[in-house]
Amino acid sequence: MSRFLICSFALVLLYPAGIDMYLVGLPRIAADLNASEAQLHIAFSVYLAGMAAAMLFAGKVADRSGRKPVAIPGAALFIIASVFCSLAETSTLFLAGRFLQGLGAGCCYVVAFAILRDTLDDRRRAKVLSLLNGITCIIPVLAPVLGHLIMLKFPWQSLFWTMAMMGIAVLMLSLFILKETRPASPAASDKPRENSESLLNRFFLSRVVITTLSVSVILTFVNTSPVLLMEIMGFERGEYATIMALTAGVSMTVSFSTPFALGIFKPRTLMITSQVLFLAAGITLAVSPSHAVSLFGITLICAGFSVGFGVAMSQALGPFSLRAGVASSTLGIAQVCGSSLWIWLAAVVGIGAWNMLIGILIACSIVSLLLIMFVAPGRPVAAHEEIHHHA
């Protein structure tokens, strides 16, 4: 079992590493490519676009051909794209490389969640996804620090060579450690069960909405945090970094505590707790009389996301044993596109950073609480499939 957990964690971590590792080198990248930092900030959106594009096909291929045939090309593409970015001499080529990086990371991301659905029952999967969420929270803190240390002695290109080496490690794991977990193709008698795993299932759609809104909350916070903390609240850059590190610490602590909480409380209770924390955060930020109270509200955001997201993802994947890849892709596309659409629309309409965050917190909590309380799971399918090792 440990091989599947290690491989799944490695496959997922390419996604945040690809986002956070290069940011510290952005000024030098812009200078070398004769582009402004503002022009290169679009690299974040381009990377997410690549991920979304990969998710359009990766899940279906993973369900038809297996997890390894998607993970291996995905990791290989991430390696090639990282090298391509390091060799880019224009901003256009650099952005093309970032799109390809997103494609590779997206393939790996989809496969990771499908593997966990294949190999773990509902309760264990919820615990593992909570742990995975905690580990993912480490990357935004450690990746920029690692990038800074690398750039003390090496040029910015070394950041992408480091990403390439990470991709090589994931490729080796996918080739030699990961075993195929895709359930055997259903016999004719099993076709009704395959057809019953509809993406239009009310319970699945409710969890798509909940997880998409939750991701929108956390990405809105990350996207607006420089404005909130430095421009509005007046913190210095060093203080901003310290606060973000502390929020990551809160996220990790809650994420690593959630598996123990699942041994005591029902998953539904933790999901309700998550949304109540979001609602409390929104109200706190809306009426905050001081910076200290606002910072407390921010910690509630991190705690709320960490306590509920892994549980919601596990519930979303639960109804799918034969179409776990497609379900994982659908979740990923909805989360990436939904959160990006909200941030873009809020910016176009002219909603300020503070109100943008408060608005999504309150909307997420109200909608999600209604869905949790009124959309019950249907008849469960097999909790997990026996792993068939394919020749």
From Swiss-Prot:
The keyword Transport belongs to this UniProt entry's keyword annotation: yes
Gene Ontology biological process terms, A to Z: response to antibiotic
Top-level taxon of origin: Bacteria
Keyword terms of this UniProt record: Antibiotic resistance, Cell inner membrane, Cell membrane, Membrane, Transmembrane, Transmembrane helix, Transport
Principal location listed in the UniProt entry: membrane
Pfam families: MFS_1
Listed GO CC annotations: plasma membrane
TM stretches of this protein: 4-24, 42-62, 69-89, 93-113, 131-151, 158-178, 203-222, 245-265, 269-289, 293-313, 331-351, 356-376
Gene3D superfamilies linked to this entry: Multidrug resistance protein D
PANTHER family in the cross-refs: CHLORAMPHENICOL EFFLUX PUMP RV0191, PURINE EFFLUX PUMP PBUE
Family: Belongs to the major facilitator superfamily. DHA1 family. MdtL (TC 2.A.1.2.22) subfamily.
Function field: Confers resistance to chloramphenicol.
Entry protein name: Multidrug resistance protein MdtL
Species for this entry: Escherichia coli O139:H28 (strain E24377A / ETEC)
Taxon lineage: Bacteria, Pseudomonadati, Pseudomonadota, Gammaproteobacteria, Enterobacterales
Gene that this sequence comes from: mdtL
